[in-house]
Amino acid sequence: MTALPPLSPLSDCYGYDRGTPADRPYIDAFLAARQAGIHGDGAEVKDSTYLTSYGAHRLASITIIDIDPGNAAATLRADLAAPGSLPAAAFDVIILTQVLQLLADPAAALDNCARALRPGGTLLLTVPCLGRISPSAAGCDRWRWTPAGLTALMAAWPGPAEITAHGNAATCVAAILGAAREDLPAETDLSDDPRFPLIACAAATRAGQPAR
């Protein structure tokens, strides 16, 4: 009989204390493949990690959005799900990685992002297909999406949206156990198995012609 993994997780914080969380290589690959769209005026939630990593030399400005008054790095205090909380037509790119599951009304947040993007602007979104309950925001951790579920959620987006899914059985198990990428054997296959997605992603463009 194959030995089952331990019931206790290896990490209680997604594997950050052990190395790179299991979902991060997929998030990095998704953003790296679409980094040409990270330019102009950009916005990201909580910090500017991905904006600066993948678009620093193409960005004119960075806005850090957070509802948390304790985040000194935030430059815009806003509830993404509150209509009108983001300025209209203010951004060329918005990056939302692993945020939507913490919002009371994900559809309202997407509407808000669409309104905040200029025509031709890009939303780069990732959401969990599975994962532990947030250790820091358990009361707000409401949602998980299959690729089909994210496709349905994005159906009202005003423009084209490409939905992709990434992960496999090994990385899904690693994520649940709190194992880091560094805990996995070096030969672990990071290819995608559509039966076992760890994250779902959307690259969505706001309809209309960019201003010249």
Segments the model singles out, each with a brief description of its role:
Residues 1-89, 93, 197, 207-212:
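Conserved N-terminal segment of class I S-adenosyl-L-methionine
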Residues 18, 134-153:
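Acceptor-substrate binding/catalytic loop of class I
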Residues 33, 164-212:
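A C-terminal cap/extension of S-adenosyl-L-methionine-dependent methyltransferases
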Residues 36, 104, 118, 155:
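Short conserved AdoMet
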Residues 71, 84, 131-133, 169-171:
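Feature marks short, surface-exposed loop/turn motifs that line or immediately flank catalytic pockets
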Residues 92-104:
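A short SAM/SAH-binding and catalytic strip from SAM-dependent methyltransferases
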Residues 107-122:
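A short glycine-rich, Lys/Arg-flanked "PGG" loop and its adjoining helix->strand segment in the class I
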Residues 125-127:
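Acidic carboxylate diad motif detector
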